[in-house]
From Swiss-Prot:
The keyword Membrane does not apply. This is Lectin. It comes from Oryza sativa subsp. indica (Rice). One of its GO terms (molecular function) is carbohydrate binding. Residues 1-28 form the signal peptide.
Length: 227
């Protein structure tokens, strides 16, 4: 086999793999009404456009599910609706996680005690991107992710990078080009300063699943090794 035919074969295989991966990337990232009501993993927000991530671009206006900055309504105050992502519905009809939501009067969801974190637990991070409140407890909703939030899906996002004296994001979140912490293409893509940046950040598509990014760069290299 000639060098030319080998190269052609490698390029053809890479193109086929990339095409398949592009479909996989779309399916992996889409959620909500754009993908049959799919929920994002690890409490990632489903944006109004149906993509998973963290930060105001995903958790702000129009957020469909996950660690949305504005708590969703539920229970008797929300027409009997239950919360997405297995969150608790508080006695006042707001979705979240932690004692304010899952404690006394909780209407539905996994009511349970708080998990300690941050300044209350030697700097421990909360699981599944939950917020660590200013008081050192894990949860979701404005009581945990609002003012004083130490780590996790804080709203608004923490500042980082050159815009914040070189600070890095907690939870290995990405520091966007604009100096905000989050997850998803708007934070981990082009211009990402630190954290789990996409290797192919300059316009190269990536798959977001279980908080890991997998770039097509590695796919091409793997195909090249096979021929």
């Amino acid at each position: 086999m000639t060098m030319t035919s080998t190269t052609t074969k490698a390029m053809a295989m890479a193109a086929a793999v990339l095409a398949a991966a592009a479909v996989a990337a779309t399916n992996a990232q889409t959620c909500g009404k754009q993908n049959d009501g799919m929920i994002c993993p690890h409490n990632l927000c489903c944006s109004q456009f149906g993509y998973c991530g963290l930060g105001r671009d995903y958790c702000g206006t129009g957020c469909q599910s996950g660690a949305c900055c504005s708590s969703q309504r539920c229970g008797s105050q929300g027409g009997g609706a239950t919360c997405s992502n297995n969150q608790c519905c508080s006695q006042y009809g707001y979705c979240g996680f932690g004692s304010e939501y899952c404690g006394s009067g909780c209407q539905n969801g996994p009511c349970r005690a708080d998990i300690k974190c941050g300044s209350n637990a030697n700097g421990e991070l909360c699981p599944n991107n939950m917020c660590c409140s200013q008081w050192g407890y894990c949860g979701l909703g404005s009581e945990f992710c609002g003012n004083g939030c130490q780590s996790g899906a804080c709203c608004p996002e923490k500042r980082c990078g050159k815009q914040a004296g070189g600070d890095k994001c907690p939870n290995n979140f990405c520091c966007s080009a604009g100096g905000y912490c989050g997850l998803g293409g708007n934070y981990c893509g082009s211009g990402c300063q630190s954290g789990g940046c996409y290797k192919g950040g300059d316009g190269m598509a990536a798959i977001l699943a279980n908080n890991q990014s997998v770039s097509f760069e590695g796919i091409i290299e793997s195909v090249a090794e096979l021929v």
